[in-house]
Amino acid sequence: MSSRVLTPDVVGIDALVHDHQTVLAKAEGGVVAVFANNAPAFYAVTPARLAELLALEEKLARPGSDVALDDQLYQEPQAAPVAVPMGKFAMYPDWQPDADFIRLAALWGVALREPVTTEELTSFIAYWQAEGKVFHHVQWQQKLARSLQIGRASNGGLPKRDVNTVSEPDSQIPPGFRG
């Protein structure tokens, strides 16, 4: 088990029990790490150092300014969970896979490196809306995972590139060619 010791002064528990006043008097900064069975057990702190630490904690607990900020500025509203229809249903335009879709896909044997893009999801929904078939939510997610697996297989498992972007030539010479 790894651990971090927060003081350079280390002593065994037996030495602390034998003469705690001398050990604490020699401690740099008023703190000693006490070890038992070669592992840190606790810290021994002098009363003066404890008073300093408590005063520091109290000072940090008080606001540094008298300006109070409105909590509403920092609290973002929770996203309302989308209700998934019970039982079988036909594909609809606002359908979304679960938030942990990539993990679920891995459980189904489909390793997805990238999350579903909006283009991929829109294409999937449009296709299955036209088909008019009905499946359970989990079955729709499995179909989406397989669809992504097949669609991305031709591109090394990544989403397809945008056909409207201008490609940049690379300047590397393939092995076996002279440049």
Swiss-Prot record:
Gene Ontology BP annotations: DNA replication, synthesis of primer
Keyword annotations: DNA replication, DNA-binding, Primosome
Keyword Ribosomal protein tagged: no
Keyword DNA-binding: yes
The protein's name: Replication restart protein DnaT
Family from the record: Belongs to the DnaT family.
Function: Involved in the restart of stalled replication forks, which reloads the replicative helicase on sites other than the origin of replication. Can function in multiple replication restart pathways. Displaces ssDNA from a PriB-ssDNA complex. Probably forms a spiral filament on ssDNA.
NCBIfam families, per database record: PRK02854.1 (NF002770)
Renumbered residue ranges of the record's region Disordered: 155-179
GO cellular component: primosome complex
Summary of subunit composition and partner proteins: Homooligomerizes. Interacts with PriB. Component of the replication restart primosome. Primosome assembly occurs via a 'hand-off' mechanism. PriA binds to replication forks, subsequently PriB then DnaT bind; DnaT then displaces ssDNA to generate the helicase loading substrate.
InterPro entries membership: DnaT, DnaT_DNA_bind
